[in-house]
Structure formats: C-alpha cells, structure tokens
C-alpha cells in the first residue's frame, strides 16, 4: 500500500480540508521516494507557506509570484531565531531551494533567474546550491551518546518495568535486537515468533500500522532476530501480552493507557521518563562510578536510538567480521545470510555469558 504526501488548505471555521495544486511540487520531485521523505519536504513547504501568510504585509507579498530570494533568506533567519537546531535550518533550506527552483521552472516566479541555482556534483549525485544566505544556529557542544555500558542494561530494564512498563518489552527489543523506535511501534501481536531451540524472538518488520504518522514507518522491511538473554525477553513478553491488549482492532503489540495503538511520540515520552528516573537513581543512590556515569549521561544527548547503538556495541565485541554485525542488525537481507547463522549462535552464547557473570 503506497502512501503519498500532499499539501492541503484548511478552512479553520468549517474544519474542511482540500488538496492544494502545489502538491504537484512533492510529486514532481519525490514521487518515487519513501513516504517519510515526501512528508518531510511537504512539512517544510507548509511551514514556509504559513510563514508567508502570517507575514504577508511585512513581506509585501500577495501571491507566490511576488517571491524573491530575500524572502526565503528572511524565513530561514526567523527559523534560526526560534531556537531550532542547525540541522533543522539546513533541512528547510534544502527543501526551499528545490521549491524556488520548481516555481521558477514553471514560471510562477519570474523575478528570479534559473542562473541563481548553480548545479553542483557530489558523491551522492547532482544538486543545486542554495541561493539563500541565512544565519545558521551555532553548532551545539552537546555530543550524542550512542551506547550504554553493558553492565547498566539490567538496571535500565528494571527501571523501565517500574516507571514505563508499556514499553519495557520494546526497550528489550531495541537493546537485544537493534530495532528502531519506528519498527517497535509498527509491531503487531501476531508478528512475533520464537525459535524453539534458543528461545530467540523472530520479528516480522513491516509497515503494518498504516495509522501511524510522525516519521514512524519501518526503514527496511525484514525478518529481525532478537536475542533471548537469561530469559528476560520471555518474561517481559509473557507479562506484556497478558497486560496490554488493544481495544481498537489495531492488534498492535504496544498500546497506550486507553488501549489504543501506541504512537512514536508516546513511546518517546515513556522512554524519557525511564531515562530521567535511571539517571536520578544513579545520581542519588549510586557509588562513585555510578555517579560519574550519571553525570556523563546527563550531559550527553541520548534517546531511544541508544538501544540500537548498544546492540551494535554488544555484538561488535564478539563478531569476527563486519558481515556478522550487518546480519544481526538487519542491515543485509537475512534470507541471503545463512552463512552467518552459525556465527550468530556463537555470539549469542558469548553475550549471554556476559550477563550471567
């Protein structure tokens, strides 16, 4: 089922939406791309158009025909002043460059020449250099943490069970299977199987949740193995299935307090609650080493993706080559990776022994 992003107009009085012809911009540029890519550019255009509507008197414009390069630069500068990240402004600038070029190409903007868009080459292909000259936010000094020390994983899971039980199983899937948050919330109850011998989980990752928004699609449809360690996964799964049963016919594995399928935003909120409690626990009740870890984790920037990073770190210590890591992470086609199944068993045993000590 193919999804397409479109741009609409909303009558706020009647709450009526109509698709705007400017949606053609998305189709012309990204019709063969993933929905999330289309949606990202559509959102960037919508924010720019709403900015033009809200500031039309100050900018002295009444239609898109009045647009010039200065308007785009001014929008990007105002975006910077709102306190967003540098990457957010850069992303908006890329979309705006495409948008302006498209408007010039179809003769909507006549006071900007095609020569304003210089074509460049990179290792990824050709692109147009931005004609805008905005002020970018300063680069943040806060680094991103990608992994969690292995010895702290059991405590993190215990904290999740205590303060964010609806996602405790999801966190386990991320740490011992490398799942992204979008892949976790897309899971249905019927898409979880277990291998008889090792007890590992076999998850079928696809975009089952067509109701999901906010960049929640599965990046790569695949069958993903999640390692069973010390029976933790089995225990979490058994409790989860008993406690959380959807009432909205979604058959979602992860649900909110109302019994409806869990959104990515809600999952992240649960994770933030776990993170805050975890750091507070180490900070106020830990030994000197744990307090140092708490200080480090408090300073660093980290979120749900730390689960995938930690999984990579765990398996990398015992993998003999990059292909074993790629196979376990789901970076390569699992059906064509039978060569590495034996090494998976070896790595599994080594990982389990680490958590048994």
Labelled PLM ranges:
Residues 21-39, 43-128, 157:
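N-terminal core-binding DNA-recognition domain of tyrosine recombinases/integrases
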Residues 107, 172-199:
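Short, charged phosphate-coordinating catalytic segments
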Residues 123-154, 213-231, 247-250:
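DNA breakage-rejoining catalytic core of tyrosine-based enzymes
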Residues 150-181:
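Basic, Lys/Arg- and aromatic-enriched nucleic-acid-binding interface segment
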Residues 186-235:
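Conserved tyrosine-mediated DNA breakage-rejoining catalytic core shared by Y-recombinases
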Residues 231-273:
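Major-groove DNA-contacting interfaces characterized by cationic-aromatic clusters
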Residues 272-327:
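Short, basic (Lys/Arg/His-rich) helix/loop patches that form interaction surfaces
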Residues 329-354:
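Catalytic-site neighborhood detector that most strongly recognizes the C-terminal catalytic loop/helix
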């Amino acid at each position: 089922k193919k999804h397409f992003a479109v741009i609409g107009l909303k009558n706020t009085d009647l709450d009526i939406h109509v698709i705007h012809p400017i949606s053609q911009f998305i189709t012309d540029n990204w019709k063969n791309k993933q929905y999330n890519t289309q949606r990202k550019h559509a959102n960037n255009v919508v924010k720019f158009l709403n900015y033009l509507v809200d500031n039309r008197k100050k900018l002295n414009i009444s239609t898109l025909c009045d647009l010039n390069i200065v308007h785009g630069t001014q929008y990007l500068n105002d975006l910077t002043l709102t306190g967003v990240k540098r990457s957010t402004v850069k992303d908006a600038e890329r979309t705006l460059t495409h948008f302006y070029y498209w408007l010039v190409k179809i003769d909507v903007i006549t006071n900007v020449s095609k020569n304003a868009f210089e074509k460049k080459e990179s290792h990824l292909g050709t692109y147009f250099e931005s004609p805008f000259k905005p002020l970018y936010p300063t680069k943040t000094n806060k680094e991103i943490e990608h992994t969690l020390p292995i010895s702290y994983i059991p405590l993190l899971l215990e904290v999740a069970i205590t303060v964010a039980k609806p996602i405790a199983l999801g966190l386990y899937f991320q740490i011992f299977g490398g799942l992204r948050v979008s892949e976790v919330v897309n899971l249905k109850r019927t898409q979880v199987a277990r291998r008889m011998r090792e007890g590992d989980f076999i998850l079928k990752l696809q975009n089952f949740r067509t109701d999901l928004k906010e960049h929640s699609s599965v990046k790569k449809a695949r069958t993903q193995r999640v390692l069973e360690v010390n029976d933790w996964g089995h225990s979490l799964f058994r409790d989860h299935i008993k406690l959380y049963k959807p009432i909205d016919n979604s058959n979602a594995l992860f649900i909110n307090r109302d019994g409806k399928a869990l959104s990515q935003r809600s999952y992240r909120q649960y994770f933030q609650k776990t993170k805050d409690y975890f750091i507070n626990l180490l900070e106020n009740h830990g030994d000197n080493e744990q307090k140092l870890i708490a200080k480090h984790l408090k300073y660093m920037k980290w979120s749900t993706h730390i689960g995938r990073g930690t999984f990579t770190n765990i398996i990398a210590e015992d993998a003999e080559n990059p292909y074993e890591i790629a196979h376990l992470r789901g970076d390569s086609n699992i059906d064509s990776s039978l060569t590495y199944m034996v090494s998976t068993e070896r790595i599994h045993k080594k990982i389990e022994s680490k958590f048994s000590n």
